Curated annotation (Swiss-Prot):
Biological processes per GO annotation: 'de novo' IMP biosynthetic process
Job description of the protein: Part of the phosphoribosylformylglycinamidine synthase complex involved in the purines biosynthetic pathway. Catalyzes the ATP-dependent conversion of formylglycinamide ribonucleotide (FGAR) and glutamine to yield formylglycinamidine ribonucleotide (FGAM) and glutamate. The FGAM synthase complex is composed of three subunits. PurQ produces an ammonia molecule by converting glutamine to glutamate. PurL transfers the ammonia molecule to FGAR to form FGAM in an ATP-dependent manner.
Coiled coil start-end: none
EC number, UniProt record: 6.3.5.3
Assigned protein family: Belongs to the PurS family.
Natural source organism: Mycobacterium leprae (strain TN)
The keyword Metal-binding is assigned to this record: no
Entries under InterPro entries matching the protein: PurS, PurS-like_sf
An example molecular function term from Gene Ontology annotations: phosphoribosylformylglycinamidine synthase activity
Name the record gives this protein: Phosphoribosylformylglycinamidine synthase subunit PurS
Catalytic reaction list: N(2)-formyl-N(1)-(5-phospho-beta-D-ribosyl)glycinamide + L-glutamine + ATP + H2O = 2-formamido-N(1)-(5-O-phospho-beta-D-ribosyl)acetamidine + L-glutamate + ADP + phosphate + H(+)
Amino acid sequence: MARAVVHVMLRAEILDPQGQAIAGALGRLGHTGISDVRQGKRFELEIDDTVDDSELAMIAESLLANTVIEDWTITRESQ
């Protein structure tokens, strides 16, 4: 078994109000040096060797990400 990790993030040109709220809270809590925060999602899929990159891409585009406003990346982790 292996693990595929799909990271989904808002596109750079899309406003991220959650990220802005986190950045503001960090400043109020006394944390300095952080100029921006972007919030995203991480999906971990336990897969066997028959699942190839094109199938993972299809899953990411059709189910996990809203491709109008989000970008995604896939990495594989061995266990």
